Regions:
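Charged, low-complexity intrinsically disordered regions
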Residues: 1-315, 381, 405, 429, ...
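Conserved pre-motif I regulatory segment
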Residues: 315-357
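Hydrophobic anchor at the beta1->P-loop junction of P-loop NTPases
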Residues: 356, 386, 572
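Conserved SF1/SF2 helicase motif Ia
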Residues: 360-362, 367-398, 404-408, 563-568
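Conserved helix-turn-beta segment of the N-terminal RecA-like "Helicase ATP-binding" lobe
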Residues: 391-418, 424, 428-431, 591-595
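Inter-lobe coupling linker of SF2 helicases/translocases
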Residues: 422-469, 474-476, 480, 487-518, ...
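Walker B catalytic acidic pair
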Residues: 522-523
């Protein structure tokens, strides 16, 4: 210990490692199934038959009856006997295991079996389609077995959602462009001369198009009917016609009308025309409401889109994971995981990528450690890196060895990632056989993803954008859109050239060369700052700038999902969604990108059109001097379906669900009056903010962030703005000191302790 005293370790007095129990015989088929799942993580018929002897008496009697022989006269070859034993075992487990048609192999009858909770979950609509096709194949020897699948799957289909419960907004990408065209024609009574004409010789008329690369909608030739009464008065304004409003709405934008203000000397700036903007937004809301009424009004169109929505988004049955059968050989027997922890481990082992969205104190660290050891034992993962915040490396390592005393772990120290030692340490990861490698977030980022993977990603983006540019030019798309895409293409090409010219730093082994096939990321919310590219601009909650470490994490997650078919990634955080709705999309992008793409969601705007909504409301200005309109992406739509998709990867456990022993907090809000100096300074903030909005000040000298920060400092104590100002007796700081002193006096007899937090 710290005093230099030596004593015998716990292993001298008690068992510190749970021995592995070897089971060589069970009495029932169900027991054999449980042991198989515990030992291998799946239904292993060959293993089950090695520990369980099914009673084949009745089966032999049926054979005798069919052949006209007695039971004693029947002789079976070894292969025939093995097949009979397998058939009896499968029959005994009828309803508990199913043969998955997607994994079925007619040459190996042991392959493709799944437990009921696995097979009867996930995309059950797609599974039902496949099962029906296989059951209808009369030439398939397993057709009867697949008919049983059909019956079981039909019982677990999600309840059909009717049109009245589906929220479809303008801009939803699975609504066909021709239907958007038809809507605007009917709404504005577009004259026939201005309607679309498509032929192999020419295209003309007002047409709605979707750029598949940028997912940007544009209306071609909208000027052909921009002066009609419907376009300029009923559903539009003199400053913004209905076609332009509809185009902005398709692109999820809140319409804004701006006036050009001349500053002299050939300079000018734009200011929002509040009255015209309010009028245009009123027309925009009218168009939105009319679209909702129109979309499902025609029976054939209603059936088409209701079926699409149910087949695409309402197709999931969530799986209930039960970890009660797990034995955890090698774990410290003095530690017993709680039921929710065992279930979380089962989810990681039996499911795919996982988000442990558990509250503080739920035991996420032990869940990841146990899952790490179990997936190594079961052969589900060969090498796992556990990524934790830098201050927690030592604690994580000691907790790991407390849970698994004989674990072979490699722990990265600060010295290991110094430039002179980094290559040696990374080589140890590549060449060693470790149960787990523990390192910090920043150290993980220093292990490079291969230049080839980065180049491939950039080339794919360049190819996509080149195709989109060609498509736009063929359709005579708007020049600003083409120019914008060409600028984006140029930036990508510069990145590609920079990547080609850059020599690999330290000549390190790349992430792909390490042999790592699993990562577990603690405090994963630190990687939520991933760049989101969206057509929506000036909308709070959407950021197009991202952190480098988040991009690095995304590339590594994509690699692991590719080699593991959607597994191998575990994120753990108590705050998966804390600031904006976009954080849910980011988590889905890390963990279930392929699932989103199966639904046709390749971009954030597609996700936002299905599951979110931008709201505009009056809000107090940053400087607190008045109100202004603010657009925020802050409202969920079609939430039940979104949560079903999200819960496929997310294991959510709140403090209320776990009934954790957390004491009730008493919140006290102190209301204080400002000093005269503070009031004067708040007024000056309004002038500063107006100057920033109008672009009259260099952002290096003043900006909204600086004004906000000055406001926070002023609210705490005016001397934080100017140390020469007097100490205001009723300041927040003084009120806090008085409260702390009063609390200290009350607890001085018992020598109680206070914790004080200040976010400045």
């Amino acid at each position: 210990n710290e005093d230099g005293e030596v004593k015998k370790a716990d292993m001298f007095y008690k068992q510190t490692i749970k021995a592995k129990t070897v089971i060589d015989r069970v009495e029932t088929a169900v027991e054999a199934l449980n042991v198989s799942v515990n030992e291998f993580g799946y239904v292993n018929l060959a293993y089950m038959l090695s520990i369980y002897e099914p009673d084949i008496t009745n089966a032999k009697e049926e054979l005798a009856e069919k052949s006209g022989q007695t039971v004693d006269e029947i002789t079976l070859s070894d292969d025939a006997l093995a097949e009979l034993r397998r058939a009896v075992l499968v029959e005994e487990l009828d309803g508990l295991i199913f043969l998955n048609p997607d994994r079925y192999n007619e040459n190996n009858p042991d392959i493709g079996w799944e437990t009921a909770d696995e097979y009867l979950s996930g995309n059950v609509r797609d599974k039902l389609r496949v099962a029906k096709a296989m059951a209808a194949d009369t030439g398939n020897p397993q057709a009867e077995k697949f008919a049983g699948n059909v019956a079981a799957l039909e019982k677990v289909q999600p309840e059909w959602i009717e049109a009245s419960d589906i929220d479809v907004k303008i801009g939803t990408t699975w609504i066909e462009p021709l239907d958007y065209e038809q809507f605007i024609y009917e709404l504005l009574n577009t004259p026939r001369r201005a309607r679309a004409v498509r032929s192999q010789f020419y295209n003309t008329g007002i047409q709605v198009h979707l750029n598949k690369m940028s997912m940007e909608w544009f209306i071609e030739n909208k000027s052909m009917d921009k002066h009609s009464v419907a376009a300029t008065k009923t559903y539009g304004t003199s400053r913004m016609d209905a076609y332009s409003i509809f185009e902005d709405t398709l692109n999820l934008k809140t319409v804004t009308v701006r006036d050009r203000i001349d500053d002299g000397d050939g300079k000018y700036h734009y200011e929002v025309n509040k009255n015209e903007t309010m009028l245009a937004r009123e027309k925009q809301n009218m168009i939105k409401e009319k679209f909702k009424e129109w979309l499902f009004s025609e029976p054939e169109r209603r059936q088409k889109y209701v079926e699409y929505y149910n087949e695409t988004f309402n197709n999931i049955r969530l799986r209930e994971y039960d970890g009660s059968h797990l034995q955890f050989p090698g774990m410290n027997p003095a530690i017993e995981l709680k039921p929710h922890q065992k279930n979380a481990v089962a989810r990681i082992l039996l499911g795919g990528n996982t988000l442990l969205a558990h509250c503080v104190g739920a035991g996420k660290s032990f869940e990841m450690m146990a899952a790490c050891m179990e997936q190594k034992r079961l052969g589900l993962a060969n090498k796992t890196i556990m990524v934790v915040p830098k201050p927690l490396i030592g604690q994580t390592a000691s907790e790991f060895l407390r849970l698994y005393p004989s674990a072979n772990i490699l722990v990265a120290t600060e010295r290991d990632f110094e430039k002179s030692r980094r290559k040696q340490f990374v080589s140890r990861i590549a060449t060693g056989d470790y149960d787990c490698i523990i390192m910090s977030h920043s150290q993980f980022e220093k292990i490079p993803i291969s230049a080839e993977r980065k180049e491939r990603m950039l080339n794919e983006q360049i190819d996509e954008i080149s195709y989109a540019i060609d498509e736009m030019k063929e359709r005579n798309g708007e020049r600003w859109t083409v120019k914008q895409m060409e600028s984006q293409k140029k930036k990508l090409e510069e990145q590609l050239k920079s990547l080609s010219d850059e020599s690999r730093k330290d000549d390190l082994i790349t992430f792909e060369e390490l042999g790592v096939d699993s990562i577990m990321v603690d405090e994963a919310h630190n990687f939520k700052n991933l760049a989101i590219f969206s057509k929506m601009n000036n909308v709070s909650g959407i950021s197009s700038s991202g952190a480098k470490k988040s991009t690095d994490m995304q590339l590594k997650c994509q690699y692991l999902s590719e080699i593991n078919d959607g597994r191998g990634i575990v994120f753990a955080t108590g705050t998966p969604i804390s600031n904006t709705m976009c954080e849910m999309y980011v988590m889905q992008l890390y963990l279930q990108k392929a699932a989103l793409e199966e639904m046709g969601i390749y971009h954030f705007d597609s996700w936002a059109a299905n599951f979110g909504e931008v709201t505009t409301a009056l809000e107090l200005t940053v400087e607190g001097s008045g109100f202004r309109f603010k657009s925020r992406f802050n409202k969920f739509t079609n939430l039940p379906e979104l949560m079903n998709i999200f819960r496929e990867v997310a294991d959510v456990q709140t403090a209320d669900m776990l009934n954790l022993p957390v004491p009730q907090a008493e919140y006290i809000n102190e209301v204080l009056k400002p000093s005269e100096t503070q009031e004067e300074m708040v007024s000056s903030f309004a002038d500063r903010a107006e100057a920033v909005r109008n672009g009259n000040v260099n952002p290096r000298f003043d900006n909204m962030l600086k004004i906000t920060n000055d406001g926070r400092k002023l609210a705490l104590d005016q001397r934080l703005i100017n140390p020469l100002l007097p100490d205001f007796e009723d300041s927040k700081l003084n009120a806090c000191v008085d409260a702390m002193f009063e609390t200290w006096e009350r607890g001085s007899e018992k020598r109680l302790t206070q914790l004080f937090f200040c976010d400045l």
